[in-house]
Amino acid sequence: MRLTPEMVDVERLVGAVREPGTIDIVGDTFAIVQPFTRVPWLEAILGNPVEALIQGGSMRTHRFVDGWEDWHGVTAHRQDAWFRLLMQITELLVERSGGRAATVAPILRGPSDLAEAVLGPELMIYSLYDHPDRMRRFLDEVTDLFTEVHNGLLRRFAPVAGGTVSYFGIWAPGTVVRTQCDASAFLSAKLYRDWFVAYDLRTCEGADTSIIHLHSCSMHTVDALLETPLPHAIQVILEEGPNVPTLRAL
């Protein structure tokens, strides 16, 4: 089912008003609330069709650019209805939290992820060689959008003890940004270094503390990231799978 902004039940997503109080603690982290994170917000704002899979409870985007003429043929590369919806939900979450939970940004995918979502992996990779100027303009545009959306969220968050709580429930002084580069899984270390690390760093510059999310299949990006002062932290998900003896038995 194709999801559009007017189909979203805002009241159901933000929940009831909570009694005011101090922020709750969950284990070693602060309690958080966030705009429904299954919605691929940045991709939707860029114009990606969003498909809601009712039985699986997930949402996916579909690339909508088969060639660069499709991208340049679009008058506006920002869907204001999705942008306004994200900001509205964020404001309501802050208002209704009662200070009991920190409102944080949903998953915001980084420039390489946005390139893969809009262009698809084939056009994305070929364009690094065949259309480098167009690709750089595209990456400039989506990186600027990332920063614009994140700044809009930061302006709406309520500070916690003079700082901000991250997506991971961890407090930091000042402001925090979380970015990611999952699409680096199909990039070589050289392509990531030559093309994408600079754009990831630009997303990190939008806050006082920056975190980048990786999967274990993207560890080849770490050397390039460690050569720069940003991000301040690298968060890695270690994918689990069969051990070597099990694989041999198969």
Residue ranges and their predicted role:
Residues 1-2, 12-36, 41-47, 76-250:
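Active-site loop segments of alpha/beta catalytic cores
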Residues 6-9:
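Outer-membrane beta-barrel proteins
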Residues 47-54:
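Conserved oxyanion/phosphate-binding beta-strand-loop segments in alpha/beta enzyme cores
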Residues 54-91:
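A gly/proline- and charged-residue-enriched helix-loop-helix capping module
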